[in-house]
Swiss-Prot record:
It comes from the Eukaryota. Keywords: Calcium, Cytoplasm, Membrane, Metal-binding, Repeat, Sarcoplasmic reticulum. This protein is encoded by an amplified gene in multidrug-resistant cells. This protein has been shown to bind calcium with high affinity. Ca(2+) 2 binds at residues 113, 115, 117, 119, 124. Its main location: cytoplasm. This is Sorcin.
Length: 198
């Protein structure tokens, strides 16, 4: 069974360029990368960034383009999506993965924001999710639209938060769906950990 939000699985995000960014010396064992300058400007000596630092990094990089910078809660979601060791931080390689994902989602948002208002409506959200490979019931899409829209419009920041949460929950579900049947059975405590970690 193919899962949305994974490269090669029909959706979720698209590989993208990394854009221009100042380079810099790498942490030991890492080669220089164009994104390193943004990352190193906010990372501590441990080579990790938390949600506050990620917010500063993304704001300084201008990845949001003409849209409002990401709020702290969206940055927390981004960190949790890639926080495989549950440290509450991300390293440079995770940051590069996030950068590629964000660029893909940003391009996707732009393609559905046809009036260039900086928002999409619930119908456009449904189309966007479908083209990313998410096969959701109308009831699920309605719940998502209610959660992420304000006055019937979904901002870029909320769109990204929605994409992050869908990917993180899909990843969590996928790890438990070992038979790839689209159905899982797991303990309540495990469910709470899955949902509360994103």
């Amino acid at each position: 069974m193919a899962y949305p939000g994974h490269p090669g699985a029909g959706g979720g995000y698209y590989p993208g360029g990394y854009g221009g960014a100042p380079g810099g010396p790498a942490f030991p064992g890492q080669t220089q990368d164009p994104l390193y300058g943004y990352f190193a400007a906010v990372a501590g000596q441990d080579g990790q960034i938390d949600a506050d630092e990620l917010q500063r990094c993304l704001t300084q990089s201008g990845i949001a383009g003409g849209y409002k910078p990401f709020n702290l809660e969206t940055c927390r979601l981004m960190v949790s999506m890639l926080d495989r060791d549950m440290s509450g931080t991300m390293g440079f390689n995770e940051f590069k993965e996030l950068w590629a994902v964000l660029n893909g989602w940003r391009q996707h948002f732009i393609s559905f924001d046809t009036d260039r208002s900086g928002t999409v409506d619930p119908q456009e959200l449904q189309k966007a999710l479908t083209t990313m490979g998410f096969r959701l019931s109308p009831q699920a899409v309605n719940s998502i639209a209610k959660r992420y829209s304000t006055n019937g419009k979904i901002t870029f920041d909320d769109y990204i938060a929605c994409c992050v949460k869908l990917r993180a929950l899909t990843d969590s579900f996928r790890r438990r769906d070992t038979a790839q049947q689209g159905v899982v059975n797991f303990p309540y405590d495990d469910f709470i950990q899955c949902v509360m970690s994103v």
